[in-house]
Design a protein with these regions (language model features):
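Short, low-complexity, polar/charged sequence segments that are solvent-exposed and flexible
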Residues: 1, 24-28, 87-91, 141-145, ...
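Conserved, well-structured core segments that form the ligand-binding/active-site neighborhood
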Residues: 1-117
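Flexible, glycine/charged-enriched surface loops at secondary-structure junctions
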Residues: 8, 72, 119-126, 252
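Fold-independent oxyanion-binding glycine-rich loops
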Residues: 10, 72-74, 126-127, 140-142, ...
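A broadly tuned preference for mixed-charge, low-complexity surface segments
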Residues: 23-44, 114-136, 193-196, 225-248
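Intrinsically disordered or highly flexible coil/loop and linker segments, enriched in small
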Residues: 63-66, 121-122, 248-252
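C-terminal catalytic subdomain
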Residues: 95-199
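Extended hydrophobic packing segments that form well-structured cores
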Residues: 164-252
Length: 252
């Protein structure tokens, strides 16, 4: 695929994180909070830590000239006491493809989708699946703010710490895609309609209900991993032609 991967030691992130002072990020934190619809569980101290982490990662992006990255999120939480959700949100808004939990397949999918469509994407878990109605709910604790109509500053769902982003997304046509397989030679591709932003207490912060145009049983039967990638708009034909032309097998 022509993509070069490189491992970056988390110790380098910690080093830069510890060099950045609270005063250096205070203005940026206030500016972001002022744009939010609301700030809920998270404290000002949580916001400062999360912004320091963003600045540390951004420094590495610039030094290494990265086009995309994925974080070892839970190790970061253990070492810094904050989450990478805000950093990933801001990086995606800046055109740096940024994904969660060390998921290289999903970040590759996001990168390919951005190159082909010019659109940023939402990386999420299928957190509720109704095969009878062909509806799914996709949820995650981060999304690029530019993809939202409004956003709420929350904490991270699983750990109840740090910063999470609850995005309120526009309704309408969406495309869901995932590249997988050992050689990135398989893919799932489906379209649907985003009908609702939900607010369940037992899911990650950004939640969207999607009425799928194809059977939702795929997500229960044998999905290509957990994370899937959502784009606003219908790009099924474009993505299918690209992946088929590169010898990939479509999984239904």
């Amino acid at each position: 695929w022509g993509v070069e991967y490189t491992d970056i030691a988390l110790e380098r992130v910690y080093e830069y994180y510890n060099q950045i002072t609270d005063d250096e990020v205070g203005e940026a934190c206030a500016g972001l909070a002022g744009k939010a619809l609301a700030c809920r569980e998270a404290s000002p101290e949580d916001m400062i830590k999360a912004m320091r982490l963003y600045r540390a990662i951004r420094k590495i992006v610039d030094e290494d000239r990265l086009s995309a990255l994925t974080l070892s999120c839970f190790r970061l939480i253990e070492q810094t006491g904050t989450t990478g959700c805000l950093a990933l949100s801001l990086l995606n808004d800046e055109g740096i493809i940024a994904g969660c939990e060390g998921d290289l397949q999903s970040v590759f999918t996001m990168l390919a989708a951005k190159v082909l469509t010019g659109k940023p994407a939402f990386m999420a878990n299928p957190s509720m699946i109704n095969a009878r109605t062909n509806e799914i709910i996709l949820a995650h604790c981060t999304i690029g703010i530019a993809q939202t109509e409004q956003f709420i500053i929350r904490n991270h769902f699983e750990t109840e710490s740090g910063i999470g982003i609850q995005g309120i997304l526009p309704t309408g046509d969406v495309t869901i895609v995932k590249c997988g397989g050992e050689c990135l030679d398989e893919y799932y591709l489906g379209t649907g309609t985003l009908t609702e932003n939900t607010n369940y207490i037992n899911m990650c912060r950004t939640q969207v209900r999607i009425k799928m145009n194809a059977p939702a049983e795929y997500f229960l039967r044998n999905p290509l991993g957990n994370h899937h990638i959502m784009l606003h708009g219908n790009y099924e034909l474009m993505l299918d032609e690209f992946l088929q032309s590169n010898g990939c097998k479509r999984i239904e």
